[in-house]
Amino acid sequence: MSPLAPEAEKLAASRLFLAEIERHIQARHDFGFETTLAGRGYLRLIRRLRTDGWRVELIYVALPNAEMAKLRVAERVSHGGHDIPVSDIERRFLRSLENLFAVYASLVDRTVCLLNSGETPEIVFTQQGVHREVKQATIIQLLQGWRQT
């Protein structure tokens, strides 16, 4: 992979990632992965897994606003991690919440949404199918409110 061709590097990494997922599926090994949910690219995979008898669970780690997400990225960069442009953080923050509430939470077998803004994550809601059990009403209202801005 070449530092002079970062887009080619991202594409190669993506191919490796998808091949690893497919390897686990074929072997019927449990697996997990992290995503921002900013896109809808995993919908087909989730539908396929559920059709094939897999149980699909989503653990969504939420932040109260895009500003905190920017601070988390800045902290990561200060420790040698990769940077993300501010415009991408803002766009992904909103798209992620929209996708969580509009598509993913009801598609998977079970969703747990955690607020990760303090010392200990707090459960905001759990959901199975269309049945949502709200644990933190003010937080879920805040998160749903961001979708409409």
Model segments located where?
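NTP-dependent small-molecule kinase module
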Residues: 102-149
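A conditional alpha-helix N-cap/helix-loop micro-motif detector
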Residues: 10-14, 39, 93
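Anion (oxyanion) recognition and catalysis
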Residues: 25, 50, 105
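A short acidic, amphipathic alpha-helical/loop segment
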Residues: 44-48
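Conserved substrate/cofactor phosphate-moiety recognition/catalytic segment
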Residues: 1-29
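A glycine- and Lys/Arg-enriched "phosphate-lid" helix/loop adjacent to the NTP-binding pocket
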Residues: 54-103
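Acidic, metal-coordinating catalytic cores used for nucleic-acid/nucleotide bond scission
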Residues: 33-43, 63
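Hydrophobic anchor at the start of a short beta-strand
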Residues: 31, 56, 111
